[in-house]
Amino acid sequence: MPMRLPITRERIRTHFHYAWWQYVLLVCLAIFGWNLLYTTTRYRSPESLKVEWYCQGVVAPQAQDKLDALLEQLRLELFPDMEEVTFTSVAYDQTYGDMQLMVWSSAGQGDLYLLQREPFQNLASGGAMAQLTPYIESGALTTGDIDLTAGYVTDSETGKKYLMGVPTDSLTGLEAYGINPEGCVMGLLASGGNLDNTLKLMQWLIDNMR
């Protein structure tokens, strides 16, 4: 018969002294497993039921809260059929920024992009952004007296210039939400899953942020 040593306070203390890391590891694995389960099983709105606004730059948490509240209000008033209208600030890396934007656009991530002029031109020249002239000609988009010069992009394949963005210098109302509009251009991602509603959001910004 195997001998069983009595469990004493000293033995428990010794056990935890040498095996504490096992319990820490167990807790970490449990947290990781829970997060993984939540991430893989949580409901995600389909592309047709959400509008995603990607903006270059870092937005403070307080400004992010204001933007989230604004977009939720717009979702209820302008996009009643949408499940999500979201804002994501994008920290642009000078070395890999263009590559990162290209990966996102190729994957159809985001719908409305607001970027500094040079990154916007680089992204749009490869055809990632939708041409806006047809929307303006049909009356679906009105830009008023905004100077659209900086929104024209030379297509890398055809060599022709197309209007692919709306300069945001005059949309100074964005500053109240922590966004610096100077020197930026906003455009519609051509591969976005919700062009009509993204266009509606762009029009709202033009009408209400000047």
Language model region names:
Residues 17-40:
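Hydrophobic membrane-insertion alpha-helices, especially the h-region
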Residues 96-157:
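Extracytoplasmic "Venus flytrap"/periplasmic binding protein-like
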Residues 193-204:
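Short amphipathic alpha-helical coupling segments at ligand-binding clamshell hinges
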Residues 1-14:
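N-terminal Lys/Arg-rich, disordered targeting/topogenic segments
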Residues 26, 205-210:
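Periplasmic-binding protein-like
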Residues 45-117:
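Early extracytoplasmic/lumenal segment of secretory-pathway proteins
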Residues 167-177:
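Non-catalytic, usually N-terminal nucleic-acid engagement modules in DNA/RNA processing proteins
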Residues 179-194, 208:
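A bilobed periplasmic-binding-protein/Venus flytrap-type ligand-binding module shared by bacterial periplasmic
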